[in-house]
Amino acid sequence: MAEDMETKLKNYKTAPFDSRFPNQNQTRNCWQNYLDFHRCQKAMTAKGGDISVCEWYQRVYQSLCPTSWVTDWDEQRAEGTFPGKI
């Protein structure tokens, strides 16, 4: 168990700097990467491409966004009430 946690910590990477979001408040960065991931996933699925190219966006939004936000957004997408354009 301890070795598994050490491996996770060793391989953990935070979101890199994004010049579109230079300020401390990273809410917009979180939102944009969430949208970008799902747009990428939708586009790659439509083209029959490999979805793994979208994993970078997923890693970034999972690093930046609170889990409760992501859960709420996923539920809203499933219900068709999500406010973003994907």
Swiss-Prot record:
Superkingdom assignment: Eukaryota
Pfam annotation, one family: COX6B
GO BP annotation list: oxidative phosphorylation
Cross-referenced PROSITE patterns: CHCH (PS51808)
Gene Ontology CC terms, in alphabetical order: mitochondrial inner membrane; respiratory chain complex IV
Pathway: Energy metabolism; oxidative phosphorylation
Entry membrane topology: Peripheral membrane protein
Transmembrane segment boundaries: none
Keyword Membrane found: yes
Keyword Amino-acid biosynthesis attached: no
Domain CHCH: 27-73
Location of the motif Cx9C motif: 30-40
CDD domains: Cyt_c_Oxidase_VIb
Sequence motif Cx10C motif, location on chain: 54-65
Subunit description: Component of the cytochrome c oxidase (complex IV, CIV), a multisubunit enzyme composed of 14 subunits. The complex is composed of a catalytic core of 3 subunits MT-CO1, MT-CO2 and MT-CO3, encoded in the mitochondrial DNA, and 11 supernumerary subunits COX4I, COX5A, COX5B, COX6A, COX6B, COX6C, COX7A, COX7B, COX7C, COX8 and NDUFA4, which are encoded in the nuclear genome.
Entry function: Component of the cytochrome c oxidase, the last enzyme in the mitochondrial electron transport chain which drives oxidative phosphorylation. The respiratory chain contains 3 multisubunit complexes succinate dehydrogenase (complex II, CII), ubiquinol-cytochrome c oxidoreductase (cytochrome b-c1 complex, complex III, CIII) and cytochrome c oxidase (complex IV, CIV), that cooperate to transfer electrons derived from NADH and succinate to molecular oxygen, creating an electrochemical gradient over the inner membrane that drives transmembrane transport and the ATP synthase.
Name this polypeptide is given: Cytochrome c oxidase subunit 6B1
Organism of derivation: Pongo abelii (Sumatran orangutan)
Upper lineage: Eukaryota, Metazoa, Chordata, Craniata, Vertebrata
